[in-house]
Amino acid sequence: MSTSFACTTCTVAFNNAESQKIHWKSDWHHYNLKRKVASLPPLSAEVFAGKILSIQKQNEEVQKKAEFYQNCEVCNKKFYSEGAYSSHMASKKHRDNLSKFQRNSRIKKLQSEDASSIASSTLSMGEPVVDSEIEEEEDLASQLTSRAISLSNLSLHGRESEPSKTELATSIPQSNEASKSHLFTQEPTPEEIEAELARRSSQRLSPRDCLFCAASFSSFDTCKKHMKASHSLYIPEREYLVDEPSLFDYLAEKISIGFTCLTCNREFKSLEAVRAHMQQKGHTSIAYDTEDEQLELSDFYDFTTSYPDYAVKQDETVVEEDGSSGEGDWEDVSDDSDNSSLDSLEMGRVPIADEYELHLPSGNRVGHRSLSRYFRQNLHSSSTAVGDGASIHQNVARRAMSGNARAYRQAVETSIAGVRDGRKNYSASHIKSFQDQRRREEFANKMGIKNNTKKHFRDALLQ
């Protein structure tokens, strides 16, 4: 073979010039030229073809991923990425929705089978069913369907609960006669409600059981210390609490029977569920912020000691008790004694002149806090309160201190007398910058206090 037609870049020879020209236009030759520029050895035709096939395969995979589309009928979602679709299929939410979807499908299948069996039933004599009897059977089928749906939504206080297979099996009668004699209603019966209450009452927590976990203790005080140390339980208005055991009994009943969270009042399906919620969310405190929440616990508190007239009423009670000891202890007092002396009880009372001023027995007057901006004003004394001689003396002194004399006195008081003007200006600017820095720090502290978004702060030492 003649070697006059060869490609030194790819190290191949050709029979004629046409083959050589076609080779020079090929991708293989162009690729080897780039490798030659990069000081790399050339590739053979087989290796280059393998690289082309691998690149085409990768492009097909990328195109396949770009055209990916899947629809989840259970969750009613669309996915355009294989990773997102696989993650969704493995998620707990999808599994829960799938179980609900399958359960609803079984219920619908049972309902359709029962309705079809009742509609196609015939009399025992083999005669066709009359139109009126067909309508009666259809009404019965609809009632059975509503009963199955009501069992799926049966709850004590509006909470949803899932029916078991045995309940669905027993709710559908086996014979036509039993179906006619046993008609159901959509609302739960009082017997079912009492049974549910009895079941929950059997799980009621005792005073020695922790409200937030499964721990149990030998005494109520030990249990209370555990809840305070381990779960940060805080009892609001402890100084006014008069019936602490009853309060904890009510909280235990709210958690173990009502399955309700103490903080957010959210209802759950079981005791374990509400405990897990309170531990995960940190809802281990008693809700006592709104007026309704305070009224809910008002039976366990007594706030009479916080009333302003509580001390006066206590004194009156003591006086009445002392006076009712016996009729022989009474003495006649003349009318003059009433005018000459005041009752000690009346002197202890503080008369209120109006709603903005309080007159104390000592003669002082206390103003209302809403008028504090006026009480803090430092007003100059009026000239009428000073005699004529004093006013003349003040005018003479004011004239004497006017102008340069006043400036010199101010300089002496600020210890800058005899200092050059440049030094004075520097001192004044330094004082001004210090005042500006102080204002900035005060503003920063004020904004920090104002923007503190922590809603609740209760010191454990103040309980």
Curated annotation (Swiss-Prot):
GO terms for cellular component: cytosol; preribosome, large subunit precursor. A zinc finger (C2H2-type) spans 5-30, 70-94, 208-231, 259-283. Residues 113-124, 167-188 have a biased composition (Polar residues). It is found in: Cytoplasm. Its main location: cytoplasm. GO terms for molecular function: nucleic acid binding; zinc ion binding. The modification Phosphoserine is found at S150, S155. InterPro entries: Matrin/U1-like-C_Znf_C2H2 (IPR003604), ZN622/Rei1/Reh1_Znf-C2H2 (IPR041661), Znf622/Rei1/Reh1 (IPR040025), Znf_C2H2_sf (IPR036236), Znf_C2H2_type (IPR013087). Disulfide bonds: none annotated. Residues 317-338 have a biased composition (Acidic residues). Belongs to the REI1 family. Pre-60S-associated factor involved in the cytoplasmic maturation of the 60S subunit. Involved in the dissociation and recycling of other late pre-60S factors before newly synthesized large ribosomal subunits enter translation. This is Cytoplasmic 60S subunit biogenesis factor SPCC550.15c. It comes from Schizosaccharomyces pombe (strain 972 / ATCC 24843). The lineage of its organism: Eukaryota, Fungi, Dikarya, Ascomycota, Taphrinomycotina.
